[in-house]
Amino acid sequence: MNHSLKPWNTFGIDHNAQHIVCAEDEQQLLNAWQHATAEGQPVLILGEGSNVLFLEDYRGTVIINRIKGIEIHDEPDAWYLHVGAGENWHRLVKYTLQEGMPGLENLALIPGCIGSSPIQNIGAYGVELQRVCAYVDCVELATGKQVRLTAKECRFGYRDSIFKHEYQDRFAIVAVGLRLPKEWQPVLTYGDLTRLDPSTVTPQQVFDAVCHMRTTKLPDPKVNGNAGSFFKNPVVSAETANALLAQFPTAPHYPQVDGSVKLAAGWLIDQCQLKGTQIGGAAVHRQQALVLINEHDAKSEDVVQLAHHVRQKVGEKFNVWLEPEVRFIGASGEVSAVETIS
């Protein structure tokens, strides 16, 4: 076990894997998976490692998905993009804007690559991937059979999809299809975006505002390792939300279509005065309470203990129990993040 995973996870946690393989096409990915499986090893497929926390050394092969390529089909009503799973997400957002194909600007600066975007149904500032996803192309690892799932078949939810359930270990995402309508409609429901005028705003202005909000609030993983938002924004019943709002009338809350209410995890953590709290080398970020950072050579145990502490404090004060958005990886694969920090 001497292949360091530190360069392959944005948290910068130093654990090792038995083997690390970069796959630049589907065949290389299948070969690496089949070789490791024949040896009886667990296999983990990673993009840019921007949403994982390695808890210990990984007893198997980590495959880095670097399948590239962008194809564009110009239709009368929309642009259709077919994008390789290994393409960087933010670079794609910039590229589509430069080419005059707006629609992804709210999702600027989300770390990671295209292949990870459907797994989490990534989202920010009022837009989720499902809004623009046309399909996801996968390969069944055991057989090499190609499968195309429509957006509906992906069963997208809040930071959720079929790729976290039935398709988790049996399939690898090789490409994502996006549909960007030519009739652009700005989404200006969050943060500084609410100050923009919907009748005159341009996609570039939305992009600039999102980049400004993210760079001023969020730490750069190159300076302080992190995995972006550590916790999901909790979705609670209207009853729970009303009880909380009776006590804390200023709490940010976002009613959902199904009658539930989404709360702001960052606000809940902030109300517990946890910004700057440190355990070992891990800390709650001082500008954005939703982000846990590797401040100084943090061990994975430091991050787990800090996450547990934050969850307990918020639970005791608000009776709302936060769940990590980050995926926890043990020696032979993903483990329950909630159980790990409970």
From Swiss-Prot:
Pathway per the UniProt entry: Cell wall biogenesis; peptidoglycan biosynthesis
The keyword Oxidoreductase is annotated on this UniProt entry: yes
Domain FAD-binding PCMH-type: residue ranges = 13-183
- Signal peptide annotation: none
| Pfam families registered for this protein in UniProt | FAD_binding_4, MurB_C
* Enzyme class name: oxidoreductase
Q: Which domain of life is it from?
A: Bacteria
EC code(s) of this entry: 1.3.1.98
GO cellular-component terms in the record?
Answer: cytosol
BP GO terms, sorted? cell division; cell wall organization; peptidoglycan biosynthetic process; regulation of cell shape
Keywords attached to this Swiss-Prot or TrEMBL record, sorted alphabetically, are: Cell cycle, Cell division, Cell shape, Cell wall biogenesis/degradation, Cytoplasm, FAD, Flavoprotein, NADP, Oxidoreductase, Peptidoglycan synthesis
Where along the chain is the active site annotated?
Answer: 159, 229, 325
Alphabetized InterPro entries for the sequence = FAD-bd_PCMH, FAD-bd_PCMH-like_sf, FAD-bd_PCMH_sub1, FAD-bd_PCMH_sub2, MurB, MurB_C, MurB_C_sf, Oxid_FAD_bind_N
Q: Cofactor(s) for this protein?
A: FAD
Q: Which reaction does it catalyse?
A: UDP-N-acetyl-alpha-D-muramate + NADP(+) = UDP-N-acetyl-3-O-(1-carboxyvinyl)-alpha-D-glucosamine + NADPH + H(+)
> Function, please?
Cell wall formation.
- HAMAP family given in the database record: MurB
* Family classification: Belongs to the MurB family.
Which NCBIfam families does UniProt cross-reference here?
Answer: murB, PRK00046.1, PRK13903.1
**UniProt protein name:** UDP-N-acetylenolpyruvoylglucosamine reductase
Recorded source organism is Escherichia coli O6:H1 (strain CFT073 / ATCC 700928 / UPEC)
| Name of the gene encoding the protein in the UniProt record | murB
